[in-house]
Amino acid sequence: MESPNRTTIQEFIFSAFPYSWVKSVVCFVPLLFIYAFIVVGNLVIITVVQLNTHLHTPMYTFISALSFLEIWYTTATIPKMLSSLLSERSISFNGCLLQMYFFHSTGICEVCLLTVMAFDHYLAICSPLHYPSIMTPKLCTQLTLSCCVCGFITPLPEIAWISTLPFCGSNHLEHIFCDFLPVLRLACTDTRAIVMIQVVDVIHAVEIITAVMLIFMSYDGIVAVILRIHSAGGRRTAFSTCVSHFIVFSLFFGSVTLMYLRFSATYSLFWDIAIALAFAVLSPFFNPIIYSLRNKEIKEAIKKHIGQAKIFFSVRPGTSSKIF
């Protein structure tokens, strides 16, 4: 009896978007600006790190990798949000599974990478003499690849299980993109589905709590070392090295924790969407700002390249002919 019902739903319809054309346009314009800023801002960071050899250090290698992940993390959801605001609000069942997979896989990659970055800061401040011999370029590459492997493997069992569930009721998804809990609510309710929802909650809890504990352990050691530094300038330098990462960590994990560590707690649709926007849109939006405005070396490198671009474009067409 399940197979006929299962095939009745071939697509989901996002019902959380405004139906008014004016409201849709009002939402579309800032979202388009934010997405463009995220892509361009992160591409600038990647390019600046690649073009400046003095930035080829573990910290900037990880920042560059995080910027690359941010582009794909937002691309998994925002383009579909933009099209849903102005046109068709449906997504195929397979498309929904793919969106969930890439959104969560890139998100888990970021969680792992933020944890690795905290460990990198810990080594740089707590073991500065051994740091160059430990955090080699080879190890940086291995850690980055390990984060990606972990991220792209972890969601596979959940996605595979959801693909086997029967969906025999409403296909109206009360969310702005495909996510585990909103999709699971549309599955035909049975004991197995209820138990698996709880299992998904536990999996998310383990992932988030493990990462948060490791990061806080790293920062606990960092703070202890910083407090032992006698020079105020030295303390300021050491603190500024970590503050950008900690702000990014707080923004991302704060909203993710509210969304995925609620267990039986329920929010209104408004708060569900607000929290989802916080970690899917706003957190990636602030990351390029934090890493560029709070990082002296990246700011100086960007200014240098802007200056070079101004010189290049200020050369008049007749100048080259005069040289020859």
From Swiss-Prot:
Keyword Chaperone assigned: no
Membrane topology: Multi-pass membrane protein
Location of the protein in the cell: Cell membrane
UniProt cross-references to PROSITE patterns, sorted A to Z: G_PROTEIN_RECEP_F1_2
Top-level taxon: Eukaryota
Family of this protein: Belongs to the G-protein coupled receptor 1 family.
Gene Ontology cellular component terms for the protein in this record: membrane; plasma membrane
Cytoplasmic face of the membrane: 47-54, 120-138, 219-238, 294-324
Extracellular side: 1-25, 76-98, 160-198, 260-272
Predominant localisation class: membrane
Pfam families: 7tm_4 (PF13853)
Name used for this protein in its record: Olfactory receptor 6K2
Biological role stated in the UniProt entry: Odorant receptor.
Biological process annotations from GO: detection of chemical stimulus involved in sensory perception of smell
